[in-house]
């Protein structure tokens, strides 16, 4: 049995609707090239919480908390063709989405 080539694409953003929209767009592009695709697989959402003092010198009990969540999706492409890779390279993602590609 021959080894299968695999591409993993991780999308990360602070806006879950943006991640979902672009994950579906990547899937549509890959489906046009007849490659096998798994996903989008939702990865755990990470919540970031920052606590700061409200005043600069006194009132240690008076604090304020800021939080934001980062949402991630994983897309796996099995046996990509050169056409698949070309179409993925031509795709322009918005600035709010971070893309990590591993093969």
From Swiss-Prot:
Record-level GO cellular component terms: ribonucleoprotein complex; ribosome
GO annotation, biological process: translation
Keyword Ribonucleoprotein belongs to the record: yes
GO molecular function, one term: structural constituent of ribosome
Family note: Belongs to the universal ribosomal protein uS10 family.
Function: Involved in the binding of tRNA to the ribosomes.
Record-given protein name: Small ribosomal subunit protein uS10
Gene source species: Chlorobium phaeobacteroides (strain DSM 266 / SMG 266 / 2430)
